[in-house]
């Protein structure tokens, strides 16, 4: 299964109940944990943070994105961020179904 195929399947609101989907979700969650571990276990400049988040999200994030780690996502590839977004430390995102953060949003820590 591809990331795009998974995103399209999720949009149909059908159950995520096949072996193929479970394997894909496990693989993607493992990848997200590897990337967020690198992000969260050392100091990074904002350019480095954006680079790691681009890897996690699967596209180049806006240069105006600011994130204070630690940052957590269980999937990563279904998060969309707009321009001028700020995400404070310790935010957790469960994004298998999709998370869209619009322009200018500021998200506080939990």
Predicted regions and their residues:
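A structural motif detector for beta-strand N-caps
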Residues: 59, 63-73, 79-91, 99, ...
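Terminal amphipathic alpha-helical/low-complexity segments used for targeting or macromolecular assembly
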Residues: 1-64
């Amino acid at each position: 299964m591809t990331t795009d195929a998974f995103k399209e399947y999720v949009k149909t609101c059908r159950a995520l109940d096949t072996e193929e989907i479970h394997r894909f979700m496990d693989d993607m969650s493992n990848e997200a944990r590897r990337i967020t571990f690198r992000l969260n276990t050392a100091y990074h400049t904002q350019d480095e943070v954006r680079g790691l988040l681009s890897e996690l999200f699967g596209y180049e994030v806006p240069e105006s994105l600011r994130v204070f780690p630690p940052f957590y996502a269980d999937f990563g590839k279904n998060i969309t961020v707009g321009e001028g977004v700020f995400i404070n430390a310790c935010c957790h995102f469960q994004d298998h179904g999709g998370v869209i953060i619009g322009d200018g949003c500021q998200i506080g820590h939990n």
